[in-house]
Amino acid sequence: QYDFDEVIERRGTGALKYEALLPRWGRDDLIPLWVADMDFRTPPFIMEAIRRRCEHEILGYTVKPRPFFEAIRDWVDRRHGWKVNASEIGFAPGIVPGISSAIQCFTEPGDKIMIQPPVYHPFAMIIRENGREIVNNPLILENGRYRMDFNHMKEAVRGCRMFILCNPHNPGGRVWSPEELRRVAEICTANGTLVVSDEIHADLTLPGHRHTVFATVSEQARMNSVTYMAPSKTFNVPGLGSSYVICQNPDLFAKYQDFVSGRELAEGHVFAYDGLISAYSGPEGEEWLAQALDYIQENIRFIDAELRRRMPKIKAIMPDASYLVFLDCR
């Protein structure tokens, strides 16, 4: 039904991964593999929702409509079995801005924040930019898969006010198991360390694997976490700037909402809501995603086979989730 083979020219449209090639690397004829967005056409049902909104011809100030919350509530229930209330959902202009807000809201300058390298590099960037201290709990690469080092974590987490979890992991592709996540919850709760879980790649969990939302693994996890999600990676719409935060601890969520509201970060632009609602509501989004995941999985298999045939010394870290394939070139 959808043509994922179609090649669309993105140069000249302000696309980050193409337009930044020349100023960053001095040439623009490179294949950009440094930004995590797909080159698939934006799904037609999302484009149609945006066109309908444009037909009104007044792009004024916009409040979050009730269907925005309902669409998120129903989506995370259908996709991940996570029961949430609309009152536990908030808007975020992006995952990184959202996590940066959490850092500012729940920690103080000089506080320690733990991350698990190799991991999405903006985590370290926003910790430093907010004047906090990075504490590393490195993952262990074992038999082509990353695993957490819990013995090291128990020591590293001491004195940390926050742990930024990448679930599923970027770039390692791990879908963390419920058992692993429960251990994280136990260790962090025992040390008074808030877990901020970046779950933007959750919907891109590949066939044969199942994503587990951190907040669902235990009461400790539910009450000691803030979760960020978005349709941006799922449906290739990062330019919409439509992400969201879910927190089921009323006190934490009230503090966070007061913080972002006071900095005018709690509202989105006119297309952010309609884009998300169209992606998450109705069967079109589910069907598009199912077809996209099948296509992505075949691409990953192709990469692995070609590396084995052409460059056998380079090992692909085969992902459980996402379209990112981390290559071990050592």
Regions found by a protein language model. Name each.
Residues W34, Q248, L324-R330:
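Conserved PLP-binding active-site segment of the aspartate aminotransferase-like
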Residues L59-E186, D203-L204, H211-T216, Q220, ...:
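Conserved core of the PLP fold type I
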Residues Y2-G94, S101, A279-G282:
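N-terminal small-domain helix-loop-helix segment of the aminotransferase-like
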Residues V217-K255:
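Active-site PLP attachment segment
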